[in-house]
Every structure is written in C-alpha cells, then in structure tokens.
C-alpha cells in the first residue's frame, strides 16, 4: 500500500508538470486577427447585399458573429485610418499630437546639432518616424503576453514603430526613396506581398509563436490596385455583361476573399480557430458598379468612382465591421448601430482586460457584441484633408468635414465652399442632394461640425 501511494504521487506530479507547460485557451486571452480590407467598398460583399461580387469566405465570417452594417472609418484614404486603428486616435488628434512632438524634438540637442541638409531630411521624414512616440495597441497587448505580427499595408516605416514584436515592413533606404517602386515601399514594402504572393510569412510566425497568444495585423493590398488577379478570379465574372473595370475590381475582391479563406483554413487545421477573435474593417470606401467603366480613365481606374475613395460621400467612409469568436460571440447577428473604427482597439483592449489610453477616441463595444447593451452613439463626425483631383491620383489638399446622424449624411467642403445633404436610407449613393428641401437639418448638422471643429483645430 505504501508503494502504491508513492506511485500515485509520482504519476500526479508527472501529469501536473506536463500540463504546466501547455497554455490552454483562456477566454480573456484569445488570439486576435485584425483583417483590414484595402479599398474594399462596403457594397461589394455578398453579406452586404451585393448580387454581383462573390465573397463566400467573408460571407461566412460575417454570419459567424456580429456584423455592424453602419461602421465608419475617420478618413477617405488609407493611411489616416490605419493610424487610427493602431493608436485608437482620430487622425486630427493624431496630427495635433504629432505636431506637438515635432515641436519638442526641434528643441533637443540632437536636432539642434544637425547641419542644414540633415535638418531638411529630418523634417521631410518625421511623419514616417513619428508613430514610435505613440502608445499603440500592439504595444499594450504585450502587457498581456501577446506576440504580434504586422503584415500588409503599413505606412509608418517599420513594424517596430507600431509596437509589434515582429513584422514584414522594415523601412527603406533614404537614397532609394525616389527610385523604382518607391510608392510600394512607402505603403509597406515586403509587407504588401502578403496574400498577393503568399500567406506563408504569417503562417511561419503563428507556428513559431503558437504557445503564446498572438495578434495579427492582416492587411493585404487587396482589392487595391493593381488589378492583376489570377485568371480564375476573373473567370467568375466572365460573360456577365459587367464593364471591364468592374470585372477587374470584383476579381480582386474575390482574390482577397480566397486568401482570407486559406488563412482561416490554416488556423482550423492547427486547432487554433476556436480561440481566435476575428475582426474585419475596411480602410476606406470605393465605388464600382457593374455598368461603370473606368478602364480608360487614368484617375478613376486607380481610385474608382467619384463617390468612393478620396471623396466626402458616405460610400467613402462607411464600412462593415465584424466581430467573430466561436462559442463566445453569438452568430448571425446584424446590427445597425453607428460604430466607429476606433472602437475596435478599445474593444480589443477591453476584451483582454486592459484600459484604453486617455487620448483614445473610440469606446469599447464589447457589451453590444455580447448582446448586453445598445450603442449610445447618435452621430459620427469626421474630416478629410484630401479630395479628388483630375490632375493628381493622390488628390489635392482641402479642409472638409462630414457627419452621419440617423439617416442623414451631410458634407461640407470649406475650401471649395460646398455643402450637401443626403437621405442615405433612401439614397445610399448620395445622388440626390436634399439640402434645399431640408435647410434646417443641414444647418443643425453644420452647427454640430462647427462646434466639433473648434474643439479639434489648433491654431
């Protein structure tokens, strides 16, 4: 009997030791994958009602969790939106803080000791190096033991600036910044190969770090230009009577959908899917209806229709936002609450038990996701400093604002002294300006923007 008891104790010790090395899934430390569509207009998903675009994997993801159909990003092009996702700050607040940091750095001995040419280069490149002075969501996740990986679009020079522990974007050499493919380097360098070339870098990271909770910034340059999808995706839209530019854009949408499906299947095969929180958001909008032809239009072939990217219409800012986590978030839920993309980092931090930073604009929507509450946001206001220009695909500088409240969308281009009002419940593509018929509504929304502007603008 004495020997039997001793044997039991030894066996129990072995079991405890073996189990102690395993990190069991914990409801507070899920793996997190933030999926960011690049120039993916909200109408061009099956789950958003499109009869033209084939997106079966995104449809499955949307139906597996909570879909917010009235999500909004803060700006009409990618970089400000991506900055807001990683910091939780509005672009206008990010810019204000960056300018304050810039002013402080100009008074340091390090800056003052530079020669004139070096100071000029410092000024030109400070914006690309500025994020390293900010608190970021990946940096905060490290406090909970997360390993994080940046892949895809990333304008902020190096993945380390975002607080990631690993990544694909590793900066550029100043002397080569005006050479071949310089724009591709600015957008993320090798990071932009994810999905288009292979998902292998992110697979390798996950295999290496699967014993730790991980966060993935998954932002393929899709369906973004160039529209060079493999033929099998173009064949989906063959002989349907769509314009050539529609076929090319829709094919890129399906390409994005397929590489995401491959990523999800990779997680399922390795038993990592169940404890992974998936989040989806676009970086900005796009317009490409089946009968719109932009193939011979240099500006619109790169930026889509006039109501999408680099515009100040609803389509440019609106995005579906998805949260999916098996057995934790109820599936098949569609909500029409107004949700802001900066709510995403606040919600991620809340789910894993961390407080958001004081300068975060967004609020946690965890209770809404879990079905325990309703949204309290009655309006969303944003600004844009770029707008369409027939001479420059990057747009021209303006001061412009927009607001969504209930079924109304109002925009105000201060630079060009233009404003318009749309009933997007009945006119989602903003074709019929209602400002003459509803002047009191336009004035009220304009007053709300004016108040917001005074709070945000620094002289």
What are these regions (language model features)?
Residues 2-4, 11, 18-420, 428-454, ...:
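Formylglycine-dependent sulfatase
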